[in-house]
Amino acid sequence: AAPSEIDFRLGKIEHTRFPDGENYYRLLEAREIRNSPAVYVAGTVSDAAVMEMYNICSALVMEQCSSLHIVIPYFGYSTMERASRRGEVVIAKNIARLLSSLPTSARGNFVYMVDLHSLGTQYYFEGSIRPIHLTAEPLIRQMIADVGENPVLATADMGRAKWVQKMSGRLGLDSAYIMKQRLSGEQTEVVALNANVSGRRVVIYY
């Protein structure tokens, strides 16, 4: 929903990037922040985005917002929520720890995540910050309905297989699983498909 639909005013942030790569940020409505709840919406789509989130949210608390609400529609690195080999860095956990270290607003800090790849990610947050896991299932249901009659609900991510199976069961749809093999950090190969989707509309859920 847009800020106007939920009775929030959209704040403005001045951002300048210097030739050496350093960033300058300024909250242009700083005077309006004090004693008001602040909502920051962003995804952890890159390391730069994570640091930007941390810097701006820190500034919101320093300007004395009454409560801080971080909304993360897409939690990047969510497939790196545990180490499968010795020496691997669990980046999802480190992001959670970083956000947990934010200064705390008077009425607390909250982080909202949507359909996490692994539900365990929310338990990496520490201290007083409160993680809240949400689902976009109602929106996804509507999007599937708009596709047309009797589509196939599929996933190429085996971490989503159970979710897709449950959703397709509730909607009375067929499901499909695309088995893939990762060849490198940038290349994957499809090795199997467990359903016949020829001539049918397919909704792929990641």
Language model: regions and residue ranges:
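PRPP-associated nucleotide enzymes
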Residues: 1-206
